[in-house]
């Protein structure tokens, strides 16, 4: 018998989310960021629902090639660029724009034999200090790239570390303006948070990611609750066991939760091997038979326990929503000390996925 845990992907919600996000930046073109296999939703499964985007921004060649083979003919941007010089031949074959953030990549472009120039996204380090050239170096690097016959259209790109904060882009924007002074070029700066909350950063291309999937870039659902955005992924299971416990009984590994009164406990077929966070504490929200309740005790590999006190009608086979339309993934993540991004990406391969 198949375990009842399943993830469903709502493609209509995904299409509608794209429309909402596009309206937030009406003057910009839009990269749909689909890194890490579309935030765990599956690139092959969801790309057609995002085909109204102007392009897809991905992390690796395998996903880019998959999109091409699935029929996408528009732009595909490699956000971290190419990792080895010999990959440039593949970028050339599939016509993939690439970010450039290191000196060795410039040298590789100089030496490559390509059929046609590649469009380049020059990465500026505006303060996150991961990838990119410091602002004071950008003019020099720009001129180096402009002199390479393998380089086509160039765009300045950067990434904000704190765009969820009202003042979080002030200093990065100053650095970007410093880098761009005197350069007549397109820019791509805005991630999900900046797309929603910082129109001054929209420029030519925005790059929304997590918001397309109905979760908040700030990690707080209330920050996007009034936007119309809807969760795309729902993780469901069922009650597979019920325990009627006396006061003082321990639940789960380590006995972290003990009953203080007679309590009815439901056992759900879902655990950390399915992608549910092991660190989720007692009190993490969950929906059982349409009623909001909480987890109790430590999450096991294949199971977790829930309090059935608010839903006395629930028994074996009662439906459980771990996250989705009613139980927001941001709330589960916040309870677990993490972010919705991580939970989406951690969905285990053993969990069946259906599309709606």
From Swiss-Prot:
What function is annotated for this protein? Isomerizes L-alanine to D-alanine which is then oxidized to pyruvate by DadA.
HAMAP family hit by this protein: Ala_racemase (MF_01201)
A cellular component term from Gene Ontology for this protein is: cytosol
InterPro entries, sorted? Ala_racemase (IPR000821), Ala_racemase/Decarboxylase_C (IPR009006), Ala_racemase_C (IPR011079), Ala_racemase_N (IPR001608), Ala_racemase_pyridoxalP-BS (IPR020622), PLP-binding_barrel (IPR029066)
Q: Which cofactor does it need?
A: pyridoxal 5'-phosphate
What is the name listed in the Swiss-Prot or TrEMBL entry for this protein?
A: Alanine racemase, catabolic
Per the record, the domain of life is Bacteria
Q: Which UniProt keywords apply?
A: Isomerase, Pyridoxal phosphate
Has UniProt tagged this entry with the keyword Isomerase?
yes
- Active site at 35 (proton acceptor), 253 (proton acceptor)
For this chain, the family text in UniProt reads: Belongs to the alanine racemase family.
Cell membrane listed as a keyword: no
> Which reaction is recorded as catalysed by this protein?
L-alanine = D-alanine
An example of a GO molecular function for this protein is: pyridoxal phosphate binding
